[in-house]
Structure formats: C-alpha cells, structure tokens
Amino acid sequence: MNEQSKAGLDYAARLLAPRAMSEKMLRDKLTAKNFPQEGIDHAVERLTELGALNDGEYARMVARYYVDRGFGRQKVDQELRRRGISQEIAQEILPGLAPCSRQVVAYLEKTIRGHYTDKRLLRKAAAGLYRRGFSWEQINTAIDVYCDPQLREEQETAADREE
C-alpha cells in the first residue's frame, strides 16, 4: 500500500467515524480531496471489509429516519437516490417500510382540524401529503376514511385490534 492509499484510507475512516454515509458519498468526498482513484478504491474496499461502510444498513437508517418523520415511500425512495443508494438496495428496503396510513391520518388531523367539508383545506392537505411522498391512492383513501365518521370508526377499531 502506497502513501496516498494509506492517506485515503485514513481520511475515509475519519469521515465515517462521526456519521454513516453511502459508498457514493464517500467516493465523492475523497474525489473532492483529490485522492487518486486507486486510493479511493482501496479505501472503499477495505472499509467495506471491516463493516464500516455498508450501503444496505445506511439505506435502512435513512429510510427509518424519513418514515419516522411522516414521509411516504416516494420521498424515501427519492432521498435514497439522492444519497447514492443503488436501485437494488432501495427495492429491498422500500417494501419493508411500515404502512403509512397512520401518518397520513395524523397529517390530515393536524391540517384539517375537524373541517371535513372544507374543499380548500382538503386540497391543501392532499397537496401537502403528495409533497411528503405519499401516492394519490393513499391520499384519497385516507381522505375518504377521515371525512366519513363511520369509516373512521371502523379504521380505528381495526387499528386497535392490530396493536
């Protein structure tokens, strides 16, 4: 191992010490510091061997973060792509995410606050949910359930039985 490869590995290890990142993000940072491609490849290979660099685990962490903050699958998928996670890894993780119905209903409760018939508020809430990465199908279903007291009661009863 030459000096530049060792320096690249040391720098990469320092980058990964405080926070996780994807292989692409690490490669971009090392390239920005003008490390040679050979040194970058060596650092990535070695850190992957040691388990310090794991795109699958990083993707799961990012997905959990965004789901916990009320974002939908489309937003999670977009964020994984932005961070350099491969299509294959993203496709493994996305189906395992928790169902989003409670997040959609919570957002509707916060936005509509009991004004079930106000079309302007419903459109505003639907647009906000779409921007958060929920599909129109999920949004329309949630609005139907939220605005119909009988459906809402059935949904709450079913949710209580699941817990």
Question: Each predicted region: which residue ranges?
Answer:
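An alpha-helical, amphipathic repeat domain used for nucleic-acid recognition
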Residues: 1-163
